[in-house]
Structure formats: structure tokens, C-alpha cells
């Protein structure tokens, strides 16, 4: 678990009053980016009662909220302090009806339980949570910014290819960890990816839409962001309230393909389209963002494998990591100035070493391509 200290207590009156005031703010300005949330009728009566392990609860008396640093459809994020730690504090909305409150509370408990059981260097660290009088999640505060903000800030320039690949490997490793623990994120996009202080690594945040994979792989269609969502998440027909839908963890692989394309091009997916137009183009016309003419065939293959229509044809994140690393080793060595500024990246000391790595990488990459090509051929017969 990310947090093993046992904590408890109640909010100070001043903090409680302030937090309640916080929740009365304006609605999410990016709601247009989202699909409608589906709440099952009588969910509070039919859903099993979820609980949070007492070891995961923070002591509210040690929790102080500062300035707002982010906002989403389900809550707001603040910079704050927990004891002597500078932290990020996510305050979630309670809901206005009994059914909505029950649904949001279950979502909150699931998010807390999932965050507490996965630990990885590319996942935002979870410190704890409290449920009353407000639903709060406490995590590490990254001094960097979201990947979305960073990419917008450097436009019209693009990321250095090595930087883009290292970011993508960070993301793939985080997703590999989630999938290994039976968790589907369902909302992988640059807004939920945060840069570290030195802007050399990326961490995945926001488990608000994450779900545990069930044996039947039947889940309720919920909120997500169209431009990065796998088509099977919003299907060819609108789901009626409470209907179930089949999908698996390969929805995250599709989203990763879009994010990888974005890292390489620094453009908005489905540029020039509205959100609904983007959804229609992806689901009904099988359209995908245009690949650059000068993109490496190997990188094009990785991206196209991720966003292929048939989820079963998409690679796993373990395979994606192998392919990205293999391609990374085929690149020429970085310039001396890059090596001096990046102490995290090992420098090769001889051309022979680089050549040896490149040869191995090309062989491994060729094998993976043959594997996926054979799988596609077999599937189409």
C-alpha cells in the first residue's frame, strides 16, 4: 500500500466551513469535453456497500487547503499541506440527490482503494483520504505541470524525439502496472499526466474513472473524453440508463496510441472537429489522426497497432514498452549537450556499444512486427 499510517479525527470548524464553501463553486468549464455520466437507478439499494480501510484515512486536523490548482467534472484540486508535507488535495463533489450522492461516494471509495494498492514510480503517490464531512484524496504534489499545459506551451514546436519516447515509456509503464493489478484507467489523456519538477519524467494521476476488471468484462458506460476514448466505450448506439457494455483493458491501449501520436506531433487529436464529430469519425468511419509523412515506419506501426479497431488486436503495455525501447535503441546517440543536461540518461561510451544495442533492438522489433502481422492475418481469415 502507498500509505500505511493509521489516521483519524475530524475537521476543524474553520477548515470545514472553508471546504464546504469550495464545493459551491462554478460547474466544470470543460463539461463539453465529456460524455454524460450514467447513474443506475436505485444504485444505493442494489450496489454492495463499499468501505475504506481505516489505515488509509488521514487525520483531518493536520490537513490544510491552499490555492486551487485544478478542476474537473467531479471535483477540484488544491495545493495544501498534510502535517509537514506539501501535498495535492482533491475535494470531490457530493451530489445533489440521494442516488447521485450514493454513486459519487462509491466512485470515491473505489478510487481510494485502487490508488492505495498500486505503487509505481510513474504513478502519483497516494498518501490517504477522508470521507467525512468531505470526500478528500491526498496525493503528492508535483511541482511541474500537466502534459497538456506543457505541450500547449511549446507550440508550434515539437518535443525532441527522445523526450517524446521517454515520456511515452513512462506512461506505458504506469499503465502496465495498473493492468497488472486488474485496473482499467479509462481516462488516459495529457490532462491526467503530470510532469516532475525537472520535466524529465511523467506520472499518471486521476483514478476517478478507473475500474477493476471483472471476469465478465461488463461495465457501465460513464464519463470520458471523446478525443482519447476508444470507440467501444461509446459504441454505435446510445446506451440507455443502466445498460451494460462489454470492453476490456485494451481501451487504455487505444487512448495511449492517441497520446503517443500527440507527443510526436504536438497537435490536438481530430483537429478542426468538435468533440461529437471526433467521436463519430472514430466510431463510425474508423478515422484516426493523420500520421506525419516523415514518421518512422516503426513508430507508425506502434501507433496504428494501439488504435486498431479490434481491441483484441491491440498490443499489451508490456509489448508496447518492448517496442518503444527497441526503437529508442535504434536512434543515433544524443549530442554531448543533451547528455550533459540529462544525468538520468546513460551515455554510451563507444560506437560499438551503440551498434550492438541497435542490432539487438532491430531484431527484437522485427520479431514483434512479424508477430502482430501474423496475428492480424490469422484474424482476417
Feature roles, as predicted:
Residues 125-133:
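Short beta-strand micro-motifs within the conserved protein kinase catalytic domain, predominantly
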Residues 78-96:
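Glycine-rich ATP phosphate-binding loop
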Residues 132-140, 148-149:
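A conserved loop-to-beta-strand element in the N-lobe of protein kinase catalytic cores
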Residues 66-77:
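Protein kinase glycine-rich loop
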Residues 108, 112-113:
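Regulatory alphaC helix of protein kinase catalytic domains
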Residues 167-168:
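Activation segment signature within eukaryotic-like protein kinase domains
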